[in-house]
Amino acid sequence: NLEPLKSHTVVGLDKSCDDGSSDDMSTGMRVLSGRGAFAKFGKPSAAQAQPQPPPPPLGMMHDTNQYQCTMDTIMQAYNPHRNAGGNTQFAYCFN
């Protein structure tokens, strides 16, 4: 689902963002690209073209774990009845 959307936006929208006109947005995308689903679907072609974005694999794994932590915390906040599972994952995250 995300794959065709990404290749579609890379043509125009994503390029304007990557031009460097908005550095904050670029940084945000770089942070997102190392976490969760964006690690796979977030502008891989742009990451290869620019020497800036690619993070070290170890840091990427750590960021992914960090994101998983945040995601589970958010899910716990939105689903209080899922409390026990959220707490287990939360403890596992910060081990």
Swiss-Prot record:
Is Mitochondrion tagged as a keyword? no
Where does the record place it? Nucleus
Q: A GO molecular function for this record?
A: DNA binding
Question: Region labeled Disordered — which residues?
Answer: 1-29, 42-63
Output the Gene Ontology cellular-component terms.
nucleus
Q: What is its main location?
A: nucleus
Task: Tell me the superkingdom of the source.
Answer: Eukaryota
Keyword field: Developmental protein, DNA-binding, Homeobox, Nucleus, RNA-binding, Transcription, Transcription regulation
- The keyword Transcription regulation is assigned to this record: yes
Q: Which family does it belong to?
A: Belongs to the paired homeobox family. Bicoid subfamily.
Q: What is the recorded function of this protein according to its Swiss-Prot or TrEMBL entry?
A: Bicoid is polarity protein that provides positional cues for the development of head and thoracic segments. BCD regulates the expression of zygotic genes, possibly through its homeodomain, and inhibits the activity of other maternal gene products.
Listed name of the protein: Homeotic protein bicoid
